[in-house]
Amino acid sequence: SVGFKAGVKDYKLTYYTPEYETKDTDILAAFRVTPQPGVPPEEAGAAVAAESSTGTWTTVWTDGLTSLDRYKGRCYGLEPVAGEENQYIAYVAYPLDLFEEGSVTNMFTSIVGNVFGFKALRALRLEDLRIPVSYIKTFQGPPHGIQVERDKLNKYGRPLLGCTIKPKLGLSAKNYGRAVYECLRGGLDFTKDDENVNSQPFMRWRDRFLFCAEAIYKAQAETGEIKGHYLNATAGTCEEMIKRAVFARELGAPIVMHDYLTGGFTANTSLAHYCRDNGLLLHIHRAMHAVIDRQKNHGMHFRVLAKALRLSGGDHIHAGTVVGKLEGEREITLGFVDLLRDDFVEKDRSRGIYFTQDWVSLPGVLPVASGGIHVWHMPALTEIFGDDSVLQFGGGTLGHPWGNAPGAVANRVALEACVQARNEGRDLAREGNEIIRQACK
């Protein structure tokens, strides 16, 4: 007589549980599942739940040594996607104990690990995650958050202005610092290292940090405003990254920057902890996000990457523009912008928000609009993003025919004009162009 029946059995017998009541401590996921032809959606949904939690392809002897009921992921809901053939939203609940505390890395290894290569699925996309309060409380989150940043910078009641220094590659450190100075002197709050600028032969990081710090102090002295430059600390190893952050702090720089997807969540969380301990703000760039989030039916939606970043830690994150050169729909973008900034966000499917998310006093992140925007977009941007945002004009500053400083002046003047017009109750959508024309006289 055998102890148990080996062999392959349907996942749905164990992992499809439509009657399950979700717990407040569960991590909930909404997956867009495209099963292979002939695979029923229940089986596909259950397969996702199994493969991203306790399951393997057969019953194993060691299952008897643990409580599956306590540790298994469960597919508790399925709905067909309107307008798509053979696509379903599968809702999966994961018990909290499956995840290491304070580790975005571990959360993703489970939820979006092997399961994405699964044979029974043609494609799989993680659309949203509900992160329970009990798990959020194990994370530090953003080093400082929106309010503390405003207090540090002494800038209130308007979006902040930035500019990426171009040409992104090829300038010497001295000329790079000069461009930084001109932009800050003209009226921007921040300038930015491009995400590709790390420490290349034509400009080593230490030289760049030095000349940028000089530019910041000079511009501060002349304008009486606090200025910053996002010093990109991204590096090939975590140790080197922290070394760069330490040097930035020694120079008295207010903010450093990290590419969180190429750098990885482990490195990012380390840097975020360092930044909080040492009073540095942290600007996050999302290079590589489109590799993960651009396909509609496979990968994961950017709102998930944004939530993960808020847990891992960052004070600014690039979030699309709605109007510039890169893709992004307005309502959907505003959905994850709110997920970054607000304390509590209600479920709202029209904005792509599948779950109500409570952030319980985890600091907020400023969304950064960047990529192909310029001064004529200013009315739309102030209206769409509101005060709590950073508007970044790279070519839209440095492309000014009179040079960098006048480009910076133009952006600052346009911003102040739009904010004032809005505060006076004028309709930015309708009168935007007129407001800008008046301002530039």
UniProtKB/Swiss-Prot annotation:
Gene, per the UniProt record: rbcL
Chief place of localization: plastid
Subunit structure: Heterohexadecamer of 8 large chains and 8 small chains; disulfide-linked. The disulfide link is formed within the large subunit homodimers.
PANTHER family given in the database record: RIBULOSE BISPHOSPHATE CARBOXYLASE, RIBULOSE BISPHOSPHATE CARBOXYLASE LARGE CHAIN
Residues with the N6,N6,N6-trimethyllysine modification: K5
Cofactor binding note from Swiss-Prot or TrEMBL: Binds 1 Mg(2+) ion per subunit.
Location(s), subcellular: Plastid, Chloroplast
Binding-site residues, substrate: N114, T164, K168, R286, H318, S370
Enzyme Commission number, as recorded: 4.1.1.39
TM annotation in the entry: none
Function: RuBisCO catalyzes two reactions: the carboxylation of D-ribulose 1,5-bisphosphate, the primary event in carbon dioxide fixation, as well as the oxidative fragmentation of the pentose substrate in the photorespiration process. Both reactions occur simultaneously and in competition at the same active site.
Amino-acid positions noted as binding Mg(2+) in the UniProt annotation, renumbered to this chain: K192, D194, E195
Residues the UniProt record annotates as site (Transition state stabilizer): K325
Reactions mediated catalytically: 2 (2R)-3-phosphoglycerate + 2 H(+) = D-ribulose 1,5-bisphosphate + CO2 + H2O; D-ribulose 1,5-bisphosphate + O2 = 2-phosphoglycolate + (2R)-3-phosphoglycerate + 2 H(+)
GO cellular component: chloroplast
GO molecular function per UniProt: magnesium ion binding; monooxygenase activity; ribulose-bisphosphate carboxylase activity
N6-carboxylysine, modified sites: K192
Stated name of the protein: Ribulose bisphosphate carboxylase large chain
InterPro entries, per the entry: RuBisCO, RuBisCo_large_chain_AS, RuBisCO_lsu_C, RuBisCO_lsu_C_sf, RuBisCO_lsu_fd_N, RuBisCO_lsu_N_sf, RuBisCO_lsuI
Cofactor: Mg(2+)
One annotated GO biological process: photorespiration
